[in-house]
């Protein structure tokens, strides 16, 4: 069970990500997410995110920050004038990095 507001927010995000990946963003209700996260208060999602759109934006932003870090590290190794081939390979490597974790795979299923 979450100990504080940050834990609850992370738990809601984790469950939303998993459920969106499995069933689709539009097939999952806010109530299903709060129940899966063990929240008795149905308005927990609105309390932490304001709107469903903010939940989705937060979920996508959370993962994109990690991908931006990986992308920046890989770009730093390419030099000043990377070829198109190198840039395409870099993009493939960035998204392939998601395949190393279950939540990364969930993210790819959502944005697909």
Model-derived features: where do they sit?
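Helix-turn-helix
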Residues: 19, 26-54, 58
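Residue-level signal for short amphipathic helical patches enriched in basic/charged
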Residues: 40, 62, 102
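Short alpha-helical functional segments enriched in proximate histidine and acidic residues
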Residues: 19, 66, 98
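Short, intrinsically disordered, charge-balanced linker/junction segments flanking boundaries
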Residues: 109-112
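An amphipathic alpha-helix adjacent to DNA-recognition modules
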Residues: 9-14, 49-76
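Hydrophobic alpha-helical connector segments
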Residues: 72-107
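Generic alpha-helical secondary-structure signal
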Residues: 11, 36, 58, 87-90
């Amino acid at each position: 069970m979450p100990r504080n507001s940050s834990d609850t927010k992370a738990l809601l995000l984790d469950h939303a990500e998993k459920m969106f990946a499995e069933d689709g963003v539009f097939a999952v209700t806010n109530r299903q997410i709060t129940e899966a996260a063990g929240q008795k208060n149905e308005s927990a999602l609105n309390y932490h995110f304001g709107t469903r759109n903010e939940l989705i934006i937060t979920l996508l932003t959370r993962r994109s920050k990690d991908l931006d870090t990986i992308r920046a590290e890989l770009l730093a190794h390419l030099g000043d004038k990377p070829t198109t081939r190198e840039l395409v390979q870099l993009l493939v490597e960035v998204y392939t990095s998601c395949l190393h974790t279950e939540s990364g795979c969930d993210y790819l299923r959502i944005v697909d």
